[in-house]
Amino acid sequence: MSEIPAIEVLDLQKSFGENKAVQGVRFEVKQGEIFSLLGPNGAGKTTTISMLSCLLRPNDGDARVMGHSIRSDQMGVKSVLGVVPQEIALYEDLTARENLSFWGKMYGLRGSKLKLRVDEVLDIIGLRDRAKERVSKYSGGMKRRVNIGVALLHKPKVIYMDEPTVGIDPQSRRNILDSVVALKNEGMTVLYTTHYMEEAEELSDHIGIMDHGKLIACGTGEELVKLVGQQTRIDLTLNGDGANVMSLWRDIDGVSRVFAEDGLVSVLVTDSNLVLPHLFEAAAKLLIRITSVDIREPNLEAVFLHLTGRALRD
C-alpha cells in the first residue's frame, strides 16, 4: 500500500471580490520532503497557506493534509499541522521560555512533559542560552525563531513556514534555513513559501512557482531550469545610451532576448563564449563602452523570467 501524500492540493480557488487571489492551484507534497512555493509578493502564496491552514475557506476545490480534508475535517488537519505565520505571534513582555510554555499549555502539555518539550524546542531554534530574556529584547530574527518554536511544540507531522526570513539579519536567516533542514532530517514535511530564489534552490526537494494566483510550474530545481534550456544571462553595464546597441544585439546569432533592468542591460544567450565578443564589437561601433560584465548560468530567476517575461523581484 502506497504512502498517502502529506499535502494534496486539489484545484483550490479563492477570490476577494473581483480579485482572483488563487486560481485552480493543484500540487502534491510527499511525506518528509521540503516543498517551496516561490513567487513575488502578491502571487497568492499566503492565501494558499491560509486555506491549507483552515484559516480561509476556499471558494472552490479542496486539499488534504495527511488525509484530512480542509473542508470537512478541520480538527484533523490542525492535529497534524504546525504553522509559522509571517506575523510575529508572541507576548513581548514574556521570556522565550514563558512564551513556549504558554503555547505548550494551549496544546495540552503539562508538567515534566511541557518542560522537556520546551527545552527540546529551545535547542532546535538555538535559543537555550537566551531563554530567560524577554522577547522584547530580541532581534527580529530571534523573534522569528521563537515563532518557529511555537509551531513545533506539539510535534506536528507537517509544518507550514510563510516567508520566515523576511526582514532579518543574515545570521538569523542562516539559523532558520538550517533549522528547516533539521526538521526534514527528523522526518517532518515542510511547506515553505518565499520570494528568495536562492532559498528555494538550497532547501527544496520540489518547487512550485506561483504568479498572479496560479501555479505556473512545478518540479525539482533541475527540472524547472530545463524549461529555459541552456540559456545563460549576461548582465552588462554601459557607459552611454543603451537603446541603440540593444537593437543591434537583438540581431546577433545566439541572442534570444535583450532587456534593460535596474540600470543594467541583460542579454539571454545560448553560448556566452561565442556571443560575448559580438556584443563588444557592436557596442564599439556605436562608441559605447561596456564597463562591467556578469555572466549568470541558468537558475530559477531565469525560469521565472522565461515564464512571465519579468524578473522575480519585480
What are these regions (language model features)?
Residues K155:
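Conserved catalytic motifs of ABC-family nucleotide-binding domains
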Residues G61-S72, G76-V77:
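Conserved ABC transporter NBD signature motif
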Residues I159-D162:
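Catalytic Walker B motif of ABC-type/P-loop ATPase nucleotide-binding domains
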